[in-house]
Amino acid sequence: SVIKRKGVHKMFYQLFYDKENAEIKIAPLSKSFKNSTFTSDKISKLAEDEVWNYNSFYTFAKNRNVLKLKAHEIKEKWLAEAESRLNAVKNIKI
Protein backbone atom coordinates (compact mmCIF):
# COMPACT_ATOMS: atom_id res chain seq x y z
CA SER A 1 0.00 0.00 0.00
CA VAL A 2 1.19 3.48 -0.70
CA ILE A 3 1.11 5.94 2.17
CA LYS A 4 1.23 9.59 1.14
CA ARG A 5 3.11 11.87 3.51
CA LYS A 6 4.23 15.31 2.37
CA GLY A 7 4.45 14.17 -1.23
CA VAL A 8 6.38 10.99 -0.38
CA HIS A 9 5.05 7.59 -1.43
CA LYS A 10 6.21 4.67 0.68
CA MET A 11 5.37 1.01 0.26
CA PHE A 12 4.66 -0.97 3.43
CA TYR A 13 4.44 -4.75 3.63
CA GLN A 14 2.75 -7.35 5.76
CA LEU A 15 3.81 -10.86 6.67
CA PHE A 16 0.92 -13.20 7.50
CA TYR A 17 1.68 -16.52 9.17
CA ASP A 18 -0.63 -19.23 10.44
CA LYS A 19 1.15 -22.25 11.90
CA GLU A 20 -2.00 -24.37 12.21
CA ASN A 21 -2.68 -24.09 8.47
CA ALA A 22 1.02 -24.05 7.45
CA GLU A 23 0.69 -20.72 5.68
CA ILE A 24 3.18 -17.86 5.30
CA LYS A 25 2.53 -14.94 2.92
CA ILE A 26 4.18 -11.60 2.23
CA ALA A 27 2.14 -8.91 0.51
CA PRO A 28 1.76 -5.15 0.27
CA LEU A 29 -0.07 -3.74 3.28
CA SER A 30 -3.76 -4.57 2.99
CA LYS A 31 -6.37 -1.85 2.74
CA SER A 32 -7.77 -2.57 6.21
CA PHE A 33 -4.37 -2.00 7.83
CA LYS A 34 -3.53 0.91 5.51
CA ASN A 35 -6.72 2.69 6.54
CA SER A 36 -5.85 2.36 10.22
CA THR A 37 -4.09 5.55 11.31
CA PHE A 38 -2.56 3.71 14.27
CA THR A 39 -1.07 0.99 12.07
CA SER A 40 0.24 3.24 9.29
CA ASP A 41 1.72 5.70 11.81
CA LYS A 42 3.42 2.88 13.71
CA ILE A 43 4.92 1.37 10.53
CA SER A 44 6.03 4.75 9.18
CA LYS A 45 8.18 5.22 12.32
CA LEU A 46 10.04 1.94 11.83
CA ALA A 47 13.63 1.95 10.64
CA GLU A 48 14.17 0.39 7.21
CA ASP A 49 15.45 -2.86 8.76
CA GLU A 50 12.89 -3.11 11.60
CA VAL A 51 9.77 -5.23 11.88
CA TRP A 52 6.70 -4.70 14.03
CA ASN A 53 4.99 -7.79 15.40
CA TYR A 54 1.37 -6.69 15.37
CA ASN A 55 -0.05 -9.94 16.79
CA SER A 56 0.47 -13.70 16.52
CA PHE A 57 -0.48 -13.66 12.81
CA TYR A 58 0.88 -10.39 11.36
CA THR A 59 4.24 -8.64 11.23
CA PHE A 60 4.78 -5.39 9.34
CA ALA A 61 7.80 -3.65 7.81
CA LYS A 62 8.84 -1.04 5.29
CA ASN A 63 11.26 -3.44 3.63
CA ARG A 64 9.99 -6.62 1.94
CA ASN A 65 13.38 -8.34 2.24
CA VAL A 66 13.32 -7.94 6.03
CA LEU A 67 9.98 -9.76 6.05
CA LYS A 68 11.41 -12.51 3.80
CA LEU A 69 14.13 -13.11 6.39
CA LYS A 70 11.52 -13.15 9.17
CA ALA A 71 9.39 -15.61 7.16
CA HIS A 72 12.37 -17.95 6.78
CA GLU A 73 13.04 -17.72 10.54
CA ILE A 74 9.42 -18.62 11.27
CA LYS A 75 9.50 -21.54 8.83
CA GLU A 76 12.75 -22.88 10.32
CA LYS A 77 11.27 -22.63 13.82
CA TRP A 78 8.15 -24.52 12.72
CA LEU A 79 10.29 -27.20 11.05
CA ALA A 80 12.41 -27.64 14.18
CA GLU A 81 9.27 -27.93 16.32
CA ALA A 82 7.74 -30.49 13.93
CA GLU A 83 10.96 -32.52 13.78
CA SER A 84 11.21 -32.51 17.56
CA ARG A 85 7.62 -33.70 17.87
CA LEU A 86 8.15 -36.36 15.18
CA ASN A 87 11.28 -37.63 16.95
CA ALA A 88 9.37 -37.82 20.23
CA VAL A 89 6.70 -39.94 18.53
CA LYS A 90 9.32 -42.13 16.83
CA ASN A 91 11.00 -42.74 20.19
CA ILE A 92 7.87 -43.92 21.99
CA LYS A 93 8.67 -47.22 23.68
CA ILE A 94 5.97 -49.84 23.28
What kind of region is each of these model predictions?
Residues 1-47:
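Short N-terminal "domain-start" leader segments
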Residues 22, 50-51, 91:
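Short, flexible coil/linker elements and helix-boundary hinge sites characteristic
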Residues 37, 68-69, 87:
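Residues in flexible loops and secondary-structure boundaries
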Residues 44-81:
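Intrinsically disordered, low-complexity, charged/polar segments
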Residues 78-81, 85-88, 92:
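Charged, solvent-exposed faces of alpha-helical coiled-coils
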